[in-house]
From Swiss-Prot:
CDD domains: GT2_GlmU_N_bac, LbH_GlmU_C
Binding-site list for Mg(2+): D102, N224
Name of the protein described by the UniProt record: Bifunctional protein GlmU
Organism (species): Acinetobacter baylyi (strain ATCC 33305 / BD413 / ADP1)
Region described as N-acetyltransferase: spans on this chain: 248-454
Length: 454
């Protein structure tokens, strides 16, 4: 049976008070709508139809690489009207899941259950039991069968005691959608076309409406303002933290951990507080990440220790490496095993060989460092001439003295030594001592100037 996913994403999101369309607001590093599209893809849906409206150009631009059919809702006349807009492109066979771009965290397994129960009845929905149902549509049942949805404002006092509510997520036969949607009426106080009216149509046709409830309440929570967005972010992050801990990761405080992408982990990984992981990252066995670190699209091999407040982006780190605190690995940083990168060292588009060290206050950009070399404090690779970047090559077992400037393009041969304070502008042969600085001048019995009395 074919599966279509219809995503309603046309709302403006006025309460967000943002120039950004609501469905593009980020949650865990991905737009709200991106979470829903990802789930639809996990279901192997045959069609994904997204209904856009406010900020439509921005929304389409954000997801231009996705295989999506876009349908415009020029006027926001209700949820029923939104789904009506899909009829010209909606298949006549199979089932459609109706989801929302601002309800981002409904899980694949929940929707698979909904598809399963709906396949025999032709219509199913997700409901939820809550302690305080105020403001939500109530599920009216007779002999445990759904008969109607009554909005809160229209509910009697007895009906308002019902704690089972409508989440708005449906699975409906496409044949029935083609039959029911044209019959929707806007004869109500709001003058809108309500999707909930298809429930009454199903009952009138003698269909039994299947229903399921999610395992986790936050799956069906929507986002209307920044408070709700922040609350859902924390719920989601806590679930991700729990999943990692169940896989053997030690998180010092699960409530102070953010995963904004995917993380592949080995055994006995330890992550301290306030660590942010973005994009696609991988941590090998026995890796330790200190407090306040940010990792983005980075792979760290087994046994490496990262001290607090280090930032990595598009970097690869070898085994048993020591990094930080306050180190920065920029895109193209590639560290071999047993490298030491210390405090306030920045590495960009540079490979560093086995066992080499840059322990203090150093910039290595567009460079190649061999094995077993020592880069002294304050060393700078001067890679930019104001127009172009140039490469510095440092061989194996090289010693670079403190406060040296290596003006690229330049190479330092294996076993060479550069004296402290040098500005190296020419290639240094292997096993050579090179130094370049002004001669030291001494003035005996020198008296510093005295401050003038006011």
């Amino acid at each position: 049976m074919t599966t279509t996913v219809i995503i309603l994403a046309a709302g403006k999101g006025t309460r967000m008070r943002s120039h950004l369309p609501k469905v593009l607001q980020p949650l865990a590093g991905r737009p709200l709508l991106g979470h829903v599209i990802q789930t639809a893809k996990q279901l192997n849906a045959n069609n994904i139809i997204t209904i856009f409206g406010h900020g439509g150009a921005q929304v389409q631009q954000q997801f231009q690489q996705e295989n999506i059919q876009w349908v415009e809702q020029t006027e926001q006349l209700g949820t029923g009207h939104a789904v009506q807009m899909t009829l010209p492109v909606l298949p006549h066979d199979g089932l459609s899941l109706i989801l929302y771009g601002d309800v981002p965290l409904v899980r694949q397994q929940t929707l698979e259950k909904l598809l399963a129960v709906s396949s025999t009845t032709g219509i199913g929905m997700i409901t939820l039991r809550v302690e305080d149902p105020t403001g939500y549509g109530r599920i009216i049942r007779e002999s445990d069968k759904i008969q109607a949805i009554v909005e809160h404002k229209d509910a009697s006092e007895q009906q308002r005691q019902i704690q089972e509510i409508n989440t708005g997520i449906y699975c409906v036969s496409n044949q029935k959608l083609h039959e029911w949607l044209p019959k929707l009426s806007n004869n109500n106080a709001q003058g809108e076309y309500y999707l909930t009216d298809i429930v009454a149509m199903a009952v009138a046709d003698g269909l039994e409406i299947a229903s399921i409830q999610p395992d986790l309440a936050f799956e069906v929570e929507g986002v209307n303002d920044r408070l709700q967005l922040a609350a859902l972010e924390r719920e989601f992050q806590l679930q991700q933290a729990k999943s990692l801990m169940q896989q053997g990761v030690t998180l010092t405080d699960p409530s102070r951990f953010d995963l904004r992408g995917t993380l592949k982990i080995g055994q006995d990984v330890r992550i301290d507080i306030n660590v942010i992981i973005e994009g696609n990252c991988e941590l090998g066995d026995f890796v330790e990440i200190g407090a306040g670190c940010v990792l983005k699209n980075t792979k760290i091999a087994a046994g490496t220790k990262v001290q607090p407040y280090s930032i990595f982006e598009d970097a690869v780190v070898g085994e048993n490496t020591q990094i930080g605190p306050f180190a920065r690995l920029r895109p193209g940083a590639h560290l071999a095993a047993e490298v030491h990168i210390g405090n306030f060292v920045e590495v960009k588009n540079t490979s560093i060989g086995v066992g080499s060290k840059a322990n203090h206050f150093t910039y290595l950009g567009d460079a190649e460092v061999g094995a077993g070399s020592n880069i002294g404090a304050g060393t700078i690779t001067c890679n930019y001439d104001g127009a172009n970047k140039h490469k510095t090559v440092i061989g194996d077992a090289v010693f670079i003295g403190s406060n040296s400037s290596l003006v690229a393009p330049v190479s330092i041969g294996d076993g060479a030594t550069v004296g402290a304070g040098s500005v190296i502008t020419r290639n240094v042969p292997e096993n050579t001592l090179a130094f370049e600085r002004a001669q030291q001048i001494e003035k005996a019995n020198y008296q510093r100037p005295q401050k003038l009395k006011k």
